[in-house]
Amino acid sequence: MFISVLLILFALCVTLIPEAHYHMVRVWSFVATIIPMWVVTWMWWNFDASGHGLQMLVILGRSHLAFGIDGVALSLMLLTTVLFPICMMLLRTVAGFMTFILLEVLVLSALCVLDLLGFYILFEASLILLFLLIGRAPYGSLEAAYKIVLYTMAGSLVLLPTLFMIYSECGTTNVLYMTCAYNHQTVLGWGLLAVLAVKIPLMPVHLWLPEAHVAAPTAGSVLLAGVLLKLGGIGFLRFMLPVVPEFCVSVFPLVSTLCLVSFLFSTLSTLRQIDLKKIVAYSSIAHMSMVTLAIFSQSEFSAYSSSFLMIAHGLISPALFLIVGILYDRAHTKFILYFSGLGASMPIGSTLFFLFTLGNLAFPLFPNFIAEVLCMVSIFAVHELLAYVFCVCQVLGAAYGFWAFNRVVHGLPRGPADVTRTEFHTVLPLLIGAVWLGIKPMA
């Protein structure tokens, strides 16, 4: 809560600076995203990892609006505060600075809010900024922006009346005090599943994500893959499993089928894409499908494995979008057919592309490897056949990853310049974080 207030104050300070002083606006905006990172680092240092349940609880008066963190939320908050300064280095407009500061306020608040209605409001408010970010980008698309709104609002219209019904029955929407009878669990469970399946996303409500990534600027794609998709995962872990546990057990066959179809379809779709951003976007759908299935398995390692995969994906996928953005700045295209021989003209960029491609394919020494192994263990505990099918589908993931890398890096060189110092520094923290988590996952 303190971080959100601090960011709002910084946003107000930035608005008082004349636009003519662009450099000062950029510096203050960057500082506005650095300070929350230090605050969250202090929270990490003082967090009791051996304890269970929520810590650092803050309850606002009689409204029962509560904020608190657990290990999953704190890890995602740390990831969020690392990604936002990187995005600030990519922005060039004052409106973009303000949009990203406000978006960080909404995301950090959503990660630590304990009220279902509050989560819903913050969740939907982030869509407004995402709509502006995608619809008004230099090469943005209003069609993609409207797609996001239509898909998400369809799920939200199911959840909102359900929340009012639950509030009339329980007198609160705070997860600390909510108790739902089984008949209410069914109604609330379907509402939550409808809205979170769009956000994470699962088939058949996934089509907005590739279009959004293609239309968004590089900074928008970094946040969408690294942070905003994780709101669906935190919604499942914090609100759905504790509030409607019996519904989650009864709906597991349906969810597991959706996850399997989403994983298989997104992987096969990736093999036929020619847009580099769509390749990374469809791979994100595959990873988040595995996250969802691990969560609903409710085995001993399900919470840890799913949250670890979200964090690993939040490091690897944004880095791939950064590299695609670097290639776009050189060639002004994202189509894979126009790239060739970058290994000769961009040795540093090609090396980074190779390393993060390995990370995306769950190669050892990267956190995706540990996370996906733990997810497989969680799935094996409840359904062995399903786990075997997921293991076989992983081979397709290796196929599209190496095909894209081979097409871009090898062949006759076409001469784009290598990465600049600033571009290298935007990717370097993600590489360090990914390798560190891959070597020391319990840190």
Swiss-Prot record:
It catalyses: a ubiquinone + NADH + 5 H(+)(in) = a ubiquinol + NAD(+) + 4 H(+)(out). One of its GO terms (cellular component) is mitochondrial membrane. The chain crosses the membrane at residues 1-21, 27-47, 71-91, 93-113, 114-134, 148-168, 187-207, 217-237, 247-267, 279-299, 308-328, 335-355, 362-382, 385-405, 423-443. Belongs to the complex I subunit 4 family. This is NADH-ubiquinone oxidoreductase chain 4. GO terms for biological process: ATP synthesis coupled electron transport. It comes from Chlamydomonas reinhardtii (Chlamydomonas smithii). PANTHER family: NADH-UBIQUINONE OXIDOREDUCTASE CHAIN 4. It comes from the Eukaryota.
